């Protein structure tokens, strides 16, 4: 009897073989759910929430976040896979598949009496060797636009259908190249993702400027200005209550009038400063002048600005203030005391677009924008969500490629190369740990197998063809998902991120090892002691 049972008769315990069986079945259950998602030919999953909201997705990360997983081991694997996505932006589904397969292969040997500890030693040796192989086969190359487009396309085609992926690829790569600075880390927050429920998903485009999700608040303001100066400020142009809730006392109506006038004058002086600056820089020319303010602008101030032909937007989001100055230039101001023409940015075109109840302000034709907007369009909400998730992963894939300075061939080529190298390496490992290396090599082959299976080909036949081709030609051969035949991934331009594969090897081995070494599962929390 388990020791914990003596202390707490209500505790649930699974021991040795039973504990392992519970864990392996959890990993395989999760693997079966995500198996059909892998690769560009993977299928969709429809998630229906308790409130009846529908989400259509192929992205493993979204699935694992949205699914309610009860089983503790499955939940642990899901957390590891989503952490993989947080770190590298890709490889979630592969992570779950490889962990499930490592446990499945290990189970074959354990059922024949091999101790889990010996298998885990083999796993560790195999991981070290696999990382060496990865170092050898990575391709260091100049990250030009062509290469980045191949990397982004490989990532995006696994998330959305091919036609849309090709549209998004160009937009994603161009947005990264626009915000990239020499020898500085890439800040993906400088790419704003704005959604419009409008037209079809292939109308998604890159705006070399900014799109704000609100418009001017005065009917007389121009809807379109060209060659515009942009003033970004965080100054209140409305009367605000004091922060400490203090009040004023006045003896008579005259005093109250004076007080109101003083308040009004205080705001009007600020508006006058803006108007004077506009007259100074625009003169009699028909150049536009746009004020974008993070705080409020009251109706009187809006009226005064509209009379002067100034377009004013109030309550802009804080994240957009930083992007604005990067896109248009200029300096954001917290006070109007040191207002001068050097503080102004410039945009070639500013216009307002109305879509149903919503208004959007486009700031375009900026001279060298360091911040851009990806305008996502789609007919309904779940299409927009799906595209946004895909774009996020696409942006990360391009960023990783630039940061790594190298890429690895995709289409299962890396996994086949590692598996073949491990089988040769096996004979140099001492003792029974060889079996762990063999299990690791077999587990890696799940990726090309599932890619072939999801494309409708016989998985064993395809795998045999690829392995034969690999050993004969010595090239990095992957699966051609259109024909089921072997192909050289590098020639076709199918590239994966190096850091994704590296992270994959580390996290899968650690989690599979930990799960194999569990020989007792106890559910003996405080709740079990009640009653």
From Swiss-Prot:
GO terms under cellular component: chaperonin-containing T-complex; cytosol; microtubule
Species for this entry: Oryctolagus cuniculus
Entry protein name: T-complex protein 1 subunit zeta
Family: Belongs to the TCP-1 chaperonin family.
GO molecular function: ATP binding; ATP hydrolysis activity; ATP-dependent protein folding chaperone; unfolded protein binding; WD40-repeat domain binding
Keyword Transferase: no
Binding residue positions for ADP: 39, 91-94, 158-159, 411, 496
Residue(s) of cross-link: Glycyl lysine isopeptide (Lys-Gly) (interchain with G-Cter in SUMO2): 251
């Amino acid at each position: 009897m388990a020791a914990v049972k003596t202390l707490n008769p209500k505790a649930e315990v699974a021991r040795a073989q039973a504990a392992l069986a519970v864990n392996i079945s959890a990993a395989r259950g999760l693997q079966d759910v995500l198996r059909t998602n892998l690769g560009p030919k993977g299928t969709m999953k429809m998630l229906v929430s308790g409130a009846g909201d529908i989400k259509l997705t192929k992205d493993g990360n979204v699935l694992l976040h949205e699914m309610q997983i009860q089983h503790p081991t499955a939940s642990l694997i899901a957390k590891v896979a989503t952490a993989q996505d947080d770190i590298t932006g890709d490889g979630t589904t592969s992570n779950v598949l490889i962990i499930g397969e490592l446990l499945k292969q290990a189970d074959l040997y354990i059922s024949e009496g091999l101790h889990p500890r010996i298998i885990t030693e083999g796993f560790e040796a195999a991981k070290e060797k696999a990382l060496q192989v990865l170092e050898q086969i990575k391709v260091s190359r100049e990250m030009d636009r062509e290469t980045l487009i191949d990397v982004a396309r490989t990532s995006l085609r696994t998330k959305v259908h091919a036609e849309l992926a090709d549209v998004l690829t160009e937009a994603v790569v161009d947005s990264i190249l626009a915000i990239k600075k020499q020898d500085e880390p890439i800040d993906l927050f400088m790419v704003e993702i704005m959604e419009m429920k409008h037209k079809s998903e292939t109308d998604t485009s890159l705006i070399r400027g900014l799109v704000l999700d609100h418009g001017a608040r005065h009917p007389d303001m121009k809807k379109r200005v060209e060659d515009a100066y942009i003033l970004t400020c965080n100054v209140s142009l409305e009367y605000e209550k004091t922060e400490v809730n203090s009040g004023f006392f006045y003896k008579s109506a005259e005093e109250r009038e004076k007080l109101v006038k003083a308040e009004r004058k205080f705001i009007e002086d600020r508006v006058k400063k803006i108007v004077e600056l506009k007259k100074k820089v625009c003169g009699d020319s028909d150049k536009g002048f746009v004020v974008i303010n993070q705080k409020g602008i009251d109706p009187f101030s809006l009226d005064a600005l509209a009379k002067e032909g100034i377009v004013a937007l109030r309550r802009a989001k804080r994240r957009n203030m930083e992007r604005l100055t990067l896109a248009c230039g200029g300096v954001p101001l917290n006070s109007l005391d040191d207002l001068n023409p050097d503080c102004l940015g410039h945009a070639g075109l500013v216009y307002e677009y109305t879509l149903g109840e919503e208004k959007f302000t486009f700031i375009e034709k900026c001279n060298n924008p360091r911040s851009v907007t990806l305008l996502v369009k789609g007919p309904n909400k779940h299409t927009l969500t799906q595209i946004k998730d895909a774009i996020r992963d696409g942006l990360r894939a391009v960023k990783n490629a630039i940061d790594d300075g190298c890429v690895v061939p995709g289409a299962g080529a890396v996994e086949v190369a590692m598996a073949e190298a491990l089988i040769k390496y096996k004979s140099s490992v001492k003792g029974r740990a060889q079996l762990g290396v063999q299990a690791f090599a077999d587990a890696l082959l799940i990726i090309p197998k599932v890619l072939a299976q999801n494309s409708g080909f016989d998985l064993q036949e395809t795998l045999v063809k690829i392995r034969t081709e690999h050993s004969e030609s010595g090239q990095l051969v992957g699966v051609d998902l259109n024909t089921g035949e072997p192909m050289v991934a590098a020639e076709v331009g199918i590239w994966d991120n190096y850091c994704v594969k590296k992270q994959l090897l580390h996290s899968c081995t650690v989690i599979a090892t930990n799960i194999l070494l569990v020989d007792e599962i106890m559910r003996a929390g405080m709740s079990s002691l009640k009653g």
